[in-house]
């Protein structure tokens, strides 16, 4: 009798081990990024820009947000040759353990201009479809044709730009991503900054508003040094 129960127990044990490995690998790959990452900007021509960072083209995006910036506006900015996108979120004491790339809401600035808010997104079927289509592209920009679906086709073709980025971690509250040009010259320069900042509400005597927001402890030194190296 014990010999007949031994095989099913082994099968159950193997199944549990396999499920544990799958679960751990899926959750681990979701939030892990190295010093070299794959960055993709994409969006429907009449829609908004999505920004994704992946460890490699086949891994789940560790960072995926939808910006309020229209795709057409970002295309015009990229044509200028130099684009800096800053994403800022508030530092909250009740979320001490949250990783920077897991923050859900960001204030967005593009070349110093306010561009609304960016929202963290889960990678759904539509996002995976785009990332899968551009998977073979190591660096470049282009347009994906419309699928003919009435729900998504109404926003036009999908425009994308894909490249390798160097990831620089300043602290647990600051990271920077610099687009890497294989030849070292030519093409647009794109830098993306993630900043988690402390926000204080105070009562000023010299303004009519009830309060204003003062930003503190923004770690700029790392990024200014890096930009100086790029310009030299």
Features from the language model and the residues they span:
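An exposed acidic His-Trp-rich patch
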Residues: 93-157
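Intrinsically disordered, low-complexity, charge-dense segments enriched in Lys/Arg
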Residues: 157-162, 189-190
């Amino acid at each position: 009798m014990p010999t007949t129960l031994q095989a099913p127990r082994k099968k159950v044990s193997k199944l549990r081990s396999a499920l544990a490995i799958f679960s751990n690998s899926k959750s681990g790959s979701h939030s892990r990024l190295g010093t070299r990452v794959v960055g993709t900007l994409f969006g429907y021509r009449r829609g908004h820009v999505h920004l994704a960072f992946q460890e490699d083209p086949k891994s789940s995006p560790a960072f995926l947000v939808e910006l309020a910036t229209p795709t057409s506006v970002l295309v015009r900015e990229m044509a200028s040759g130099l684009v800096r996108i800053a994403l800022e979120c508030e530092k909250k004491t009740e979320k001490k353990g949250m990783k920077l790339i897991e923050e859900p809401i960001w204030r967005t600035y593009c070349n110093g201009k306010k561009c609304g808010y960016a929202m963290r997104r889960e990678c759904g079927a539509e996002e995976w479809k785009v990332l899968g289509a551009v998977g073979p592209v190591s660096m470049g920009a282009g347009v994906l044709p419309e699928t003919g679906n009435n729900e998504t086709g109404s926003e036009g073709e999908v425009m994308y730009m894909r490249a390798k980025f160097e990831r620089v971690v300043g602290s647990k509250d600051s990271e920077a991503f610099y687009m890497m040009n294989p030849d070292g010259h030519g093409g647009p320069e794109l830098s993306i900054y993630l900043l988690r900042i402390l926000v204080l509400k105070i009562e000023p005597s010299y303004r009519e508003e009830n309060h204003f927001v003062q930003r503190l402890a923004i770690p700029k030194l790392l990024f200014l040094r890096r930009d100086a190296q790029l310009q030299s």
